[in-house]
Amino acid sequence: MMLPSRRSLLAGAAGAALTSACASTVEPPTDAAARMNAILDRRVAESLRRSPERCTSLGLTEERAGYRFIDKMSDASKQAARESRAELRAALADLRAVDRDALSARDRVTYDVVTTAWENGLATSAFDIGGGAGSPYVVTQLTGAYTNGPDFLDAQHPLRTRDEADAYLARLGEYARQLDQETAIIGEDAAASVIAPDFAIDRALVQLNAFTSRSPRDTVLVQTLVRRLPSVADLSEADRNSLIARAESAVRDAVMPAYQRQIDALRAVRPRAVHDAGVWRLPRGADMYAAALRSRTTTTLSPDEIHNMGVALIAEFNAEMDTILRAEGMTRGTVAQRVQELSRRADQLYPNTDAGREQILADLNAQTRAIEALMPQAFNTLARARLEIRRVPPYTEAGAPGGYYQRAALDGSRPGAYYINLRDTGEWPRFTLPTLNYHEGVPGHHWQISIQQESGAIPFIRSAMLGFSAFSEGWGLYAEQLADELGVYANNRLGRLGYLQSATFRASRLVVDTGMHHKRWSREQAIQSMMQATGDLESSVTTEIERYCVWPGQACSYMVGRQAINRIRDNARQRLGARFDLKAFHDTMLANGAVPLTVLEQIMTDWATAL
């Protein structure tokens, strides 16, 4: 998965566009395309100014971003979100005034993509809580500046010059300010009866306290400088020591107190927190979930339709797993019970030690090299960006998902990376690892996003700025299936079992997400449902279920997207017969960037019709 922050949810769904330069002023438009491009350029300037972190993540220059951003962090206040929403509303009104019929076919795709993104962004942010309908609680075990700020500063802030080192120190102060802004929102939302579930608050408190229990010197915020400053050529040893001392002071005097204020705020609302898992309990909860589902899936499927899709797919995948397990001589018990038994087998377990974790990373890298060699069989266009596989930082692993992807910088200065949560190697039996690799790396998120960013044929908004979970996560699941179709499991029957278990897991997500947020299931009911469907360990299932509680609808995007891609592929194959070219199908899909599923279907129908 690709892990969002509160601010990126608004920026990604409602966010920016760029067709030429990020100028603050544009020439008067002379036709429909020019009018549209002017609107998009204006909006990107607004959006990038509101997200210095996005500018850094994309590797933009100050000239392209339109301002100096390297020493700034975004405004996390509710007022800033309201101002951004007003800007977006104005941009959408202007875009709707453009004559779509006067645009070229390519520009009509951009018009449809951006319009859908902005409409969804306004719909989800209209509830004026947390990060919107898809992330209703500002601080949980997965949301809040404390979850992504340290990782951003450690992994994405550049440290190549003295100026960038000074900017890092400035960002420490900005980070403390973000924490306080989100602490204020905890109280504001609580006054509106929007409080995270008790277990989400408890997990957040564990992680916040883990940070404050360290000395400033031992936090990742200071250790980043200790580790990286020696490579800055124009710094003397005295300069390095001075910068590290200043960072320690900033953490001690600004960041740590901000953490403590956030801890105090969560403790203050904790007695009012309930154990109910779904957003149905919140004011306008049903409307909120409907908006989240529309945004996440880019469809009009109802919660009941999505729930029933999941039930049917679980039955299909379980039948295939049963066949493999019987071939392994495992015939007693349910499919889930037999998968659990296999997960505990000594030959499937890595040592729960640092050496065991290093072996997991080594095995994943070997699998990546093997699948990369097969990519010319399925694609004409190959991704160029490098991929690194990393461990989820220990300071966030308690509440982090099993894996997530971080895209490469546009300028190539930072490779793509996916993170695997290695808090307990027992959660990763050997047979489960390959399909994770294919989902997050090649031919999954890394492959799809790298080709999207490297494409010169689509506007910047569609190659780097906008995101659609149903497309990107649907592609991730389709990539798992594609790896199977390419024969990676020909001599690895248990690896294919892992793929089918993963597919079952994603189908189960449809059931439990709609179960909790629409059918009012409890957290415990959802945990039992997923364990019975997948055979996964209770610890890993619990982390997943608690994730769906705070990101309503997001888990549905995966399988809804996969099923849509398969349906579109089947339709194209049926229409074209012997003329169907899988490589061309994939190239066309990815070259057009992440798009809503409705737009994807039209793009691929037009492609097939034109052949």
Show the residue positions of the predicted features.
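N-terminal export signals
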Residues: 2-3, 8-25
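N-terminal maturation segment of proteins
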Residues: 23-611
